[in-house]
């Protein structure tokens, strides 16, 4: 059975919040088959480096990203990995009603990866849509820790979703 190892990151804010990604995140990039980045890069140099170091990158731009990043990345990135349909976006709006809004907005998605809030999130809607926000590896805001997520896709199933502290 083929397994795909995933790294989920968002809101990296390099170099405003950190000069670079933490070493543990670069280690996770090296181990991942696919890196999913849900926007707010800030500078294109980080995109260049991640494109060079990741085996595969699926990414979108965020509200803090400028013209070059918006030219190079979509607002919404869709990919199917081993039978699981992923959508990567930056913003999903306010917390109240998020599941209902996202279910209506993304009817053909199995897993929605998002960012913006810097607040980790892992829920599943009544229809089975999985909502994942990995938090931020560089800017914890009101959270106790900076974070990122890893997961595995195998046999058309998302497995082993883990929130990691930086």
What does each model-identified segment do?
Residues 13-17, 41-46, 64-70, 93-98, ...:
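Active-site environment of divalent metal-dependent phosphoester hydrolases
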Residues 53-54, 127:
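Short, structured coil segments at secondary-structure junctions
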Residues 16-27, 88-106:
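Pre-active-site segment of Zn-dependent metallo-hydrolases
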Residues 1-52, 65-74, 83, 144-147:
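N-terminal active-site segment of His-dependent metallophosphoesterases
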Residues 8-10, 34-40, 58-63, 88-90, ...:
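Active-site neighborhood of phospho(di)ester-bond hydrolases with catalytic His/Asp-centered motifs
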Residues 54-96:
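Helix-adjacent hinge/juxtasegments
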Residues 2-3, 9, 81-82, 104-108, ...:
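Binuclear metal-dependent phosphoesterase catalytic core
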Residues 76-77, 120, 149:
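Residue-level detector of beta-strand structural context in well-folded domains
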């Amino acid at each position: 059975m083929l397994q795909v190892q995933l790294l989920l990151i968002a809101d990296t804010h390099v170099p405003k919040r950190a000069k670079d990604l933490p070493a543990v995140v670069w280690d996770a990039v090296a181990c991942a088959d696919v890196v999913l980045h849900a926007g707010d890069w800030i500078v294109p140099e980080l995109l260049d480096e991640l494109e060079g170091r990741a085996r595969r990158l699926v990414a979108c731009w965020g509200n803090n990203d400028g013209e070059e990043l918006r030219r190079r990345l979509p607002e919404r990135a869709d990919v199917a990995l081993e039978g699981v349909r992923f959508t990567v976006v930056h913003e999903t709006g306010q917390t109240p009603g998020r599941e209902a809004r996202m279910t209506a907005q993304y009817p053909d998605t199995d897993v929605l990866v998002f960012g913006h809030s810097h607040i980790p999130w892992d829920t599943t809607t009544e229809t089975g849509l999985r909502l994942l926000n990995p938090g931020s590896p560089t800017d914890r805001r009101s959270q106790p820790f900076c974070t990122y997520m890893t997961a595995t896709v195998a046999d058309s199933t998302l497995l082993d979703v883990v929130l990691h502290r930086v």
